[in-house]
Amino acid sequence: MLSDYLQTVDWSRAQFAMTAIYHWLFVPLTLGLSIICAIMETIYYRTGDPFWKRTAKFWMRLFGINFAIGVATGLILEFEFGTNWSNYSHFVGDIFGAPLAIEGILAFFLESTFVAVMFFGWNRVSRGFHLSATWLTAVGANLSALWILVANSWMQYPVGCTFNIDTVRNEMTSFWDVLLSPVAVNKFTHTVTSSFVLAALFVCAVCAWYLLRGREQKMARKSIAVASVFGLVCALITAFTGDLSGAIVARVQPMKLAALEALYDGEEGAALTAVGILRPEAERSNNEDAFYFKIAIPKMLSLMSFRDADAFVPGINDLVNGNPQYGIMPTIEKIERGRVAIAELERFKQARETGDEATLDEIRAKFDPDTPEGAVFLKEYFAYFGYGYLDSPAQTVPNVPLLFYSFRLMVGAGCLFILVLAAAWWFNRRDTLERKRWMLWVLLLCMPLAYLASQAGWIVAEVGRQPWAIQDLMPVGVAASRIASGSVATTFFIFLVLFTALLVAEISILCKQIKIGPEKE
C-alpha cells in the first residue's frame, strides 16, 4: 500500500509537471500578443490608417490560434488539483480555491466574452467599441495570470491564513495579505513582463522570416518597431523584478537560494557565480569546492540578497545542520517540532472519538492564535508542521544541478534579449535591419531560446521549493490523492499524447498562417 502510494505521488508529480510545461508553452504568447495586438489596433484607431488594421488583424489571427489551444491545457491543469492532489485541496482549498474561483468567474469570462467581439466584430461594431473589446481581452488574459500567480505565490509564501483544528484546514483570514504579499506582487510582475518579452521576440522572429524572404517588408518593419520597443521595456522591468525576487527568496526560501547558487557552506560577503560547471560527485556532507571551475563576482550574492555586501548568506549545510552563530535552526529540530504538532492533531482526533471535552479544549487553545499558549505553540511548533512528515533532513535539499543550470539559462537569456531587442530597434530605426541578415537570423533563433528561458524560470520557481507543496506546511509526499498509481500513469500517457498532438497542431497551423501572411490589401 505504501509503495503504491509513493508511486502515485511520483506519477502525480510527473503528470502535473508535464501538464504545466505544455500549458506554459501557450500562455506567455497569449499574454504578450494580446497586448501587442491592442497596441497596434490603438495606432489604427488614432491614425485611421488601414495598414494598421490589416497588421493588427494578422497578429490577432495568430493570437486566436494560440489562445484556443492554451485554454484546453489550462482546464486540465486545474482539474488535476482535485483528482491527483485531494489532500492538498482539502488542507488549503479555502485559500487556494478563492483566487482560482475569481480567475474563472471574472477574468476568464471577461476575455471569453470580448474575444468574440475582437475576432468577429470588425465592421460590425464601432471602431471604439472594437478597440475596447481588444483591450478588455488583453486585460482579461492578464487578470487570469494574476489570480493563478497569486495562488502559486501563496504556496511559496503562505500568509493571510490560520489553521482550524476542527476542520483540519487552513482558512483565509486576510484576502489582501494573500493578494498583496511581496512574493505575489513580484511573481506576477516578473512572470507577466517576461511573457511580454517572449511575445515581442515571437513577433520579431516572424517579421525576420518575412524580411529574409523579401515579403511583407513594410508590415515586418512596422511590427518590429512596435515589438522591439515593447519587448525592450518589458525586458528591463523583468531584470529589475528578477533582482527583487532574489532579495525576497533570500528571506522566505533560503534553501532555494542556496541551491540556485550551489552554495554549500554559507559565507559573509558571498560571491555570485556567473558561470560554472558543477562536480556531479559533490555532496551535502563535504566541504570541497562544488565546481570544476567557476567565474564569480565577489560579494555580489550578499549584495543582491540582503543589500549588504558583507551580509552572511546561509548555505545548504547551514540550513540542514544549523548554524547557531546566525540563529539558524537545524532541520532535525524542525522535524522534531513538526512531529509534536502532528502528535497534537492525533491527540485531538482521539479525544474527539472518545468525547474527551477537556482534552479537546486544551488542544484547541494551543491552535488558537488569540490565546497565550496558542501564540507560542503556533510559532514554535506548528510553523514547522510540514517538517514532521519528512524522514530525514536531506529531503529538504532540492535538485541542485537542475536549479543551478536552469537559473543561469534564464538569466543569461534575459540579458541576451535586452541586447537583441535594443539592436533590433536601432537597426530598424536606421532602416538597415533587412540588410543585416545575421541580425535577422539572431531574431529567429531567439524565439525558441525565449521558450526555453521561460520554462527554465518555472523550473527555478517550482523545483526550488521542493519538497514542499506548501512551504514548510505540507510536503508533496502527503499532498497527493490515495488513488491507484496505475490510473495516474495511464492518464499521464493519455495527456502526453493529447498535448503533443495539440502542440504539433498549433505549430503547423501557425506556420501555415504565417506563410499565408496578412490579408491582401
Q: How should each PLM-predicted stretch be described?
A:
Residues M1-I21, G48-T55, F79-A101, S153-T189, ...:
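Membrane-interface interhelical loops and short amphipathic "cap" helices
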Residues M1-R46, R54-F58, F63-G70:
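N-terminal signal-anchor module of multipass membrane proteins
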Residues T47-I65, F91-G97, A101, G121-V139, ...:
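Membrane-interfacial loop-to-helix junctions in multi-pass inner-membrane proteins
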Residues G64-T73, W135-P158, G231-G242, F348, ...:
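Hydrophobic alpha-helical membrane-insertion segments
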Residues N66-L136, S153, V463-Q466:
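Membrane-interface helix-loop-helix modules in multi-pass inner-membrane proteins
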Residues A116-R124, F129-W135, L146-M155, F175, ...:
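Internal alpha-helical transmembrane segments
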Residues A151, V233-E353:
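Aromatic-rich transmembrane-lumenal/periplasmic boundary elements in polytopic membrane proteins
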Residues D391, Q395-W458, A489-Q513:
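C-terminal substrate/ligand-recognition segments
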